[in-house]
C-alpha cells in the first residue's frame, strides 16, 4: 500500500484506525473469529494432554512393556512432538500458509487419535499391539507438532499489528485455554482409564476415545470461522534463509584464499554482495541490509550458546509424565478417604503454574530486588535450573522411602525362595546345604503379615537344587528333606502343608494398573474328595486337586446368610475370580521326591482392598459354595499376597488357610510428591518462562521465528537425552537415577553461570531503524512457544 493512500484507507489496520483503549471499544473491534481459534486450542489441548496423561501406564499395563521401556517410549513420543514443529513452520511459512496447514494437519492428527483409541480396544496380547498403537502415536506426534507453531500465530494475524493491547489480551485468553484444557483433561482422563469397558478392568478406549472426539471437535470449530479469517499468504521461510546463509558462508570460507581473510566466518557470505544493486540496502539509506542480517545471525549464535542448559531442563521436567507417574504407582494414593490416581498428580503442576506466575511477578521478584539483588533474565534462569535440580533430589529422597516397599527381584544368576509353613502345631529347624540353620515357625490365621520376609537367595550360573532339611522335636510332626529344582532369575514359594510339601514359581510385583489395588494369588491344596458335596461341577478322584474357579466376594460382616446375595458378579470392585490355575505337585514327606497328590496354583489378580470371603464357583458364576474359612482382610493398596488353603490333615475335610505377604503394601503417602512438584514448578517459572523471554528478546526482530523453532527443538533434544540414558539401562534404582539427573542439571547450570558471567552481553535493539512486529507464540506447555 503506497504512502499517499494511508489517510484515505478506512479499513481497520490503517494508521487512522487508532487502537481502542476502552473495554467498550475493545469489545466492538474485537475479531470475533478469534474465539473459534481459542475454542480450537482448548479442545486440542484437552485432546493432547488427556491422551498423554495415561500414556505411560498404557505402555506399562496394556502393552506390557517394562517400566524402563515405557519411559523410553513416552519420551520418544515427546521427541516427535517437539521436532515436528519445524516441519509445520516450513509448510506454513513457505508453502500453503497457516490456515491450510492447521486444517490439513488437524485432520491427520485426529486420524492418529482415532487409530490409537481403536487399537486400545483389543485385549492385551492381541496381534494389533503394539504396531497400531505406535503408528497412531507417530501420527499424533507429527500432528500436534505440525500445528504447534501455527495456531497462536494465526490468531495473532487476525489483529491489526498496532493493536498491541488487544493482541496481549488475545494471548492471555489463548494461554488460559491451553492451561484450562490441560488441567481438565489431566484430571478427568485418568478417571476414564480407571473404568471398566469391553471386558477389561480398565477403559483406555474411553481415555483415548474422548480426546479423539475432542480433536474432531477442535477441527470443526476451527473450520467454522473459515469465511471470516484473515489468511496471510506464505512468504520466504526465514529458517531456510538462515540455513542457506550459514551454508554459503562455510562454502565460501572453504574456497577462499589465505590472503582474503574475514574477521568472522559468517562474513564470507557477503562475498559477491553489492549494496548498490540491493533494493533492501537502498531502502535503508546506505545501511547494508545483508551486513546487518549477518550481525543478527552472529547474535543468534550467542543466544544458542546460552541455550545449552535448556535441553537438560526439559530432560528433567518431562519426567513428570513418566518416572514420576511410575513412582506414584508405588505410593499410597488414599488421602482423607479419597483416592488420587497416580497419573492425576500432574494436575498439580498445571494448577501451580497459574498460581505462581502472578506471585513471582508481583511479590517474589520485587521483594528480591528491594533487597539489592537485580533479577536479570540469566540470574532467574540460573535460579530456576538449581530449583529443578533440587526437585529431583527431593524426588530421590522420597524414592529412598519407597524402595523398602518394592519387591525382591532376583538377578540373572540368582534364585529366590520363600518357605511357608502351614502345618498346625509344627515348628521346624531348617538346614539348607551348609548354611547356618534357622527356625521356621508355623503360620496361623488367614490375616496377612504386616511385613515381608526377605527370601532365601541362591547364586550360580545354572539351575539350583538345594538340599533343604526340616527337623523338629515334636512326635507328630514330619522330618524330611526337600530338593526343589530352582531356575535362575526366578522367585519360588515352598509350602509345607499337612498333605505334603509343594513348590511353585511366583512373580513378585506390585499391581501395575494404578487404580489403588492389591494383588492376590492362591495355592489350593485340597483333594477333590474333600470339597463340599454340592460343588457338583468338579468330578475327580481323591488324589487330584480341585481345578475349578475360586471367587472372592466382598463382605461387610463374618456372617453369611445367602451365598448368592454375597457374590454379585456384576458388582464392580466387590467380585473377583481366580480362574487361571496350573497343577501343583504335592510331595510326600516320607517318600523323597514322590508326588502323591495334586493341588492348584492360581495366578494373582488385582483387586480393591477390603474384606473378602472365598467361594467355590462354577463357570457360569451362578453357584457359590463358601470355603469354611474366616474372611481375608487387607485395607492397603500395592501389596502382593499368597493365600494357601489346605486340609487340616490328609484324612480331614476341614480346611485351614494362611496368607503370606510377598510384596509390601504402599506405605509412603502420595502427598509426599507435592514438595517435588512445588519446587519443580517454581523452577519452571524462573527457568522456562524467563528462558523464553530471554531467547525472544535477545534475538533480532527478523530472526525471532528461528528462535521459536529452536526453543521447541530444545524440548526434543531434552527428551532424546532421557531416551538415550534409559536405553543404556544404567540405573536399577530410581533414587540413584533422580540424584544423577539432579547432579547433571547442577553441573550444566554451573557451566551456564560461567557463560553468563564471562561470555554473554545483552543485546540492544533500541536503535534499530527497521521495526518488525512479531507476535510471540505461546506454547501449550506453559512456556514453550
Swiss-Prot record:
Location(s) in or outside the cell: Membrane
Glycoprotein among keywords: yes
Topology term for the membrane: Multi-pass membrane protein
PROSITE patterns: PTR2_1, PTR2_2
Keywords: Glycoprotein, Membrane, Peptide transport, Protein transport, Transmembrane, Transmembrane helix, Transport
Gene Ontology molecular function: dipeptide transmembrane transporter activity
Entry comment describing in which tissues the protein is expressed: Expressed in vulval, pharyngeal and anal muscles.
NCBIfam families noted in UniProt: 2A1704
Entry similarity comment: Belongs to the major facilitator superfamily. Proton-dependent oligopeptide transporter (POT/PTR) (TC 2.A.17) family.
Stated name of the protein: Peptide transporter family 2
Lineage: Eukaryota, Metazoa, Ecdysozoa, Nematoda, Chromadorea
Amino acid at each position: 500500500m503506497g504512502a499517499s493512500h494511508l489517510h484515505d484507507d478506512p479499513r481497520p489496520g490503517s494508521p487512522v484506525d487508532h487502537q481502542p483503549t476502552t473495554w467498550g471499544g475493545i469489545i466492538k473491534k474485537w475479531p470475533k473469529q478469534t474465539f473459534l481459534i481459542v475454542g480450537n486450542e482448548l479442545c486440542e489441548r484437552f485432546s493432547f494432554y488427556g491422551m498423554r496423561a495415561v500414556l505411560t501406564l498404557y505402555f506399562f499395563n496394556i502393552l506390557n512393556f517394562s517400566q524402563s521401556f515405557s519411559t523410553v517410549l513416552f519420551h520418544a513420543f515427546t521427541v516427535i512432538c517437539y521436532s515436528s514443529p519445524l516441519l509445520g513452520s516450513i509448510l506454513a511459512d513457505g508453502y500453503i500458509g497457516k490456515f491450510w496447514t492447521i486444517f490439513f494437519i488437524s485432520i491427520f492428527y485426529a486420524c492418529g487419535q482415532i487409530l490409537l483409541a481403536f487399537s486400545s480396544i483389543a485385549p492385551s496380547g492381541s496381534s494389533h499391539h503394539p504396531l497400531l498403537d505406535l503408528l497412531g502415536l507417530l501420527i499424533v506426534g507429527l500432528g500436534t507438532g505440525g500445528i504447534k507453531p501455527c495456531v497462536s500465530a494465526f490468531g495473532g494475524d487476525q489483529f491489526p499489528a498496532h493493536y498491541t493491547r488487544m493482541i496481549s489480551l488475545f494471548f492471555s485468553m489463548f494461554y488460559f485455554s491451553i492451561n484450562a484444557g490441560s488441567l481438565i483433561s489431566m484430571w478427568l482422563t485418568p478417571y476414564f482409564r480407571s473404568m471398566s469397558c469391553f471386558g477389561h478392568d480398565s477403559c483406555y478406549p474411553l481415555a483415548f476415545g474422548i480426546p479423539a472426539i475432542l480433536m474432531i471437535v477442535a477441527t470443526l470449530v476451527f473450520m467454522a470461522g473459515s469465511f471470516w479469517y484473515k489468511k496471510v499468504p506464505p512468504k520466504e521461510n526465514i529458517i531456510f534463509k538462515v540455513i542457506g546463509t550459514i551454508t554459503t558462508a562455510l562454502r565460501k570460507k572453504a574456497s577462499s584464499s589465505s590472503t582474503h581473510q574475514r574477521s568472522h566466518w559468517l562474513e564470507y557470505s557477503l562475498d559477491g554482495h553489492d549494496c548498490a544493486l540491493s533494493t533492501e540496502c537502498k531502502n535503508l539509506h546506505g545501511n547494508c541490509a545483508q551486513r546487518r542480517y549477518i550481525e543478527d545471525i552472529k547474535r543468534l549464535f550467542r543466544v544458542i550458546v546460552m541455550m545449552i542448559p535448556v535441553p537438560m531442563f526439559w530432560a528433567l521436567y518431562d519426567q513428570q509424565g513418566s518416572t514420576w507417574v511410575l513412582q506414584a504407582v508405588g505410593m499410597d494414593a488414599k488421602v482423607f478417604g479419597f483416592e488420587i490416581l497416580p497419573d492425576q498428580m500432574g494436575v498439580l503442576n498445571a494448577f501451580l503454574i497459574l498460581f505462581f506466575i502472578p506471585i513471582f511477578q508481583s511479590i517474589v521478584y520485587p521483594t528480591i530486588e528491594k533487597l539489592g539483588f537485580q533479577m536479570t533474565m540469566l540470574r532467574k534462569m540460573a535460579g530456576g535450573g538449581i530449583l529443578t535440580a533440587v526437585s529431583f533430589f527431593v524426588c530421590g529422597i522420597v524414592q529412598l522411602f519407597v524402595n523398602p516397599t518394592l519387591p525382591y527381584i532376583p538377578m540373572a544368576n540368582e534364585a529366590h525362595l520363600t518357605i511357608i509353613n502351614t502345618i498346625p502345631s509344627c515348628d521346624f529347624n531348617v538346614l539348607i546345604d551348609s548354611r547356618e540353620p534357622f527356625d521356621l515357625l508355623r503360620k496361623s490365621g488367614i490375616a496377612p503379615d504386616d511385613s515381608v520376609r526377605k527370601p532365601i537367595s541362591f547364586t550360580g550360573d545354572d539351575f539350583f537344587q538345594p538340599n533343604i532339611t526340616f527337623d523338629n522335636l515334636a512326635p507328630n510332626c514330619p522330618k524330611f528333606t526337600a530338593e526343589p529344582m530352582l531356575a535362575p532369575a526366578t522367585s519360588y514359594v515352598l509350602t509345607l502343608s499337612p498333605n505334603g510339601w509343594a513348590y511353585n514359581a511366583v512373580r513378585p510385583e506390585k499391581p501395575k494398573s494404578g487404580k489403588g489395588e492389591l494383588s492376590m494369588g492362591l495355592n489350593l491344596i485340597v483333594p477333590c474328595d474333600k470339597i463340599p458335596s454340592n460343588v457338583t461341577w468338579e468330578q475327580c478322584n481323591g488324589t487330584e486337586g480341585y481345578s475349578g474357579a475360586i471367587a472372592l466376594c466382598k463382605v461387610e460382616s463374618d456372617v453369611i446368610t445367602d451365598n448368592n446375595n454375597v457374590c454379585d458378579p456384576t458388582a464392580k470392585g466387590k467380585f473377583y475370580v481366580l480362574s487361571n490355575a496350573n497343577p501343583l505337585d504335592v510331595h510326600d514327606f516320607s517318600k523323597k521326591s514322590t508326588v502323591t497328590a495334586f493341588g492348584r496354583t492360581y495366578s494373582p489378580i488385582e483387586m480393591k482392598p477390603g474384606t473378602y470371603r472365598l467361594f467355590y464357583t462354577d463357570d457360569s458364576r451362578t453357584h457359590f459354595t463358601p470355603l469354611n474359612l474366616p474372611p481375608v482382610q487387607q485395607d492397603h493398596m500395592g501389596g502382593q499376597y499368597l493365600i494357601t488353603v489346605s486340609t487340616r490333615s490328609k484324612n480331614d475335610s476341614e480346611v485351614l488357610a494362611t496368607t503370606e505377604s510377598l510384596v509390601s503394601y504402599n506405605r509412603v503417602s502420595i502427598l509426599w510428591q507435592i514438595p517435588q512438584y512445588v519446587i519443580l514448578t517454581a523452577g519452571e517459572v524462573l527457568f522456562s518462562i524467563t528462558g523464553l523471554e530471554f531467547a525472544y528478546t535477545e534475538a533480532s526482530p527478523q530472526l525471532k521465528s528461528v528462535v521459536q523453532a529452536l526453543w521447541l527443538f530444545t524440548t526434543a533434544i531434552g527428551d532424546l537425552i532421557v531416551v538415550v540414558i534409559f536405553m543404556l539401562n544404567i540405573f536399577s534404582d530410581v533414587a540413584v537415577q533422580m540424584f544423577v539427573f539432579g547432579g547433571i542439571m547442577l553441573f550444566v547450570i554451573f557451566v551456564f553461570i560461567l557463560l553468563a558471567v564471562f561470555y554473554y552481553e545483552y543485546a540492544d535493539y533500541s536503535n534499530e531503524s527497521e521495526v518488525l512486529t512479531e507476535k510471540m507464540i505461546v506454547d501449550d506447555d506453559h512456556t514453550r512457544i
